[in-house]
């Protein structure tokens, strides 16, 4: 991206992570500052739910609900979690040999894969995963699988497969599965990918080897701070600078980059101008405020109304102040196409997920409708989080689904205010 910056700001209660491109905010997340040190958290004291993502716990099963094929368990005292039993992966029990059943009182190794959202508990899985910049290691599922990101084309996959034809990687695949991430497309030689996989394999081995000696509610693994993993997980071509005005965050980021992304270290900058804050330099307060408002204006004069609810998000497209001289059909077509691009941006920026229903301005021509769906799908493919156009209903409503990973931006900001 042109003139793109990943900005980290340390506030009183949270760390802001902002992806800015040509002055526009593309992504924003607010991460609460930890209330306790790592040692206290590791002992299983109740922590902030938003800090759990990716962490591995020895959870205790409270009850199994057969009619929904799921179990509810505790990660720490008072912190419940939801475990679907549809996953065919065999759970790793620490209190007894697994006999095909999961029972109340069982102590099971789980990893948090989705944060708590509103009234819903965090979602955990028994299929553990360890993420690096180029690969994800799955040490507890069916071994031997080599899976490539759907965004990697066939020619790229062929090159990457060649990089993996090494004895060390074959040994890893005998006990684990691997997912090769989209970031691997940047590689021109295989050593960074191989070293990334071997580092993950060593980490997984260390954690699994001590799991049997840990007590219930123990936290065996807590990944690097979420704002740091964004550096690793954001595609390298999406930013040309990593900027912070906090010496503490700068040092944390420097150490993280040296270990996991040495090629990105030159992008890290410490902003030190006392005359104007980094927040004011880019007008970030106003941009964050706009990212939580209900109405979003389009350049054409049209606007979106974005209304999240408990069950889904509804987006209404309106012609608003549009004063063009084009025919009605062309007017509606142009506003809808502009709205499609802005909707894709807003979903990513606000971190809206689940079911999204969009009420575009009515169009009669089937070719215009097809063009709109194709344009919306094309825009959504730019989102690092999987987002899919499902269909247009007979009433002209467009249904989108977006994978739930983190909570909406409004919730993140409200929690930390």
Task: Label each residue range with its predicted role.
Residues 1-49, 53-55, 125, 129-135, ...:
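Extended, charged alpha/beta regions that create polyanion-binding interfaces
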Residues 57, 108-110, 178, 304:
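Generic structural signal for buried aliphatic residues
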Residues 69-73, 116, 122-124, 128-138, ...:
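Conserved glycine-centered short motifs in functionally critical loops
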Residues 79-89:
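A short macromolecule-binding patch
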Residues 94-109:
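Short nucleic-acid-contacting surface segments enriched for D/E, G, S/T with interspersed K/R
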């Amino acid at each position: 991206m042109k003139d793109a910056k990943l900005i980290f700001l340390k506030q009183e209660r949270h760390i802001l992570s902002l992806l800015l491109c040509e002055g526009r905010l593309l992504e924003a997340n607010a991460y609460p500052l930890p209330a306790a040190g790592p040692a206290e958290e590791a002992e299983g004291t109740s922590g902030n739910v938003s800090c759990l993502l990716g962490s591995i716990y020895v959870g205790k099963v409270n009850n199994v609900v057969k009619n929904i094929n799921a179990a509810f368990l505790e990660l720490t005292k008072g912190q419940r979690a939801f475990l679907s039993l549809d996953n065919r992966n065999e759970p790793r029990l620490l209190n007894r040999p697994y006999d095909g059943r999961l029972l109340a009182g069982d102590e099971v190794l789980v990893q948090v894969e989705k944060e708590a959202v509103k009234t819903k508990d965090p979602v955990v899985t028994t299929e553990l995963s360890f993420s690096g910049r180029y690969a994800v290691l799955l040490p507890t599922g069916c071994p031997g699988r080599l899976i490539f990101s759907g965004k990697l084309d066939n020619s790229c996959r062929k090159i990457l497969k060649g990089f993996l034809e090494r004895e060390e990687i074959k040994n890893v695949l005998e006990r684990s599965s691997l997912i090769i991430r989209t970031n691997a497309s940047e590689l021109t030689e295989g050593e960074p990918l191989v070293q990334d996989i071997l580092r993950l394999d060593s980490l997984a081995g260390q954690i699994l080897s001590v799991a049997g000696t840990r007590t219930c509610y123990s936290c065996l693994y807590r990944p690097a701070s979420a704002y740091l993993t964004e550096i690793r997980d954001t595609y390298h071509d999406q930013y040309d600078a990593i900027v912070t005005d906090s010496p503490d965050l700068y040092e944390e980021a420097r150490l993280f980059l040296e270990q996991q992304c040495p090629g990105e270290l030159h992008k890290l900058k410490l902003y030190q101008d006392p005359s104007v804050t980094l927040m004011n330099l880019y007008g970030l307060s106003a941009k964050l405020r706009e990212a939580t408002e209900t109405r979003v204006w389009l350049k054409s004069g049209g606007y979106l109304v974005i209304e999240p609810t408990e069950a889904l998000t509804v987006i209404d497209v309106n012609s608003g102040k549009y004063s063009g001289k084009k025919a009605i059909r062309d007017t509606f077509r142009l506003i809808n196409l502009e709205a499609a691009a802005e909707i894709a941006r807003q979903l990513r920026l606000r971190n809206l997920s689940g079911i999204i229903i969009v009420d575009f301005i009515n169009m009669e021509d089937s070719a215009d409708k097809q063009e709109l769906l194709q344009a919306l799908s094309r825009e959504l493919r730019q989102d690092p989080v999987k987002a899919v156009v499902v269909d247009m209903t007979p009433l002209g409503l467009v249904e989108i689904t977006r994978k739930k990973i983190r909570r909406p931006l409004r919730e993140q900001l409200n929690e930390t205010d």
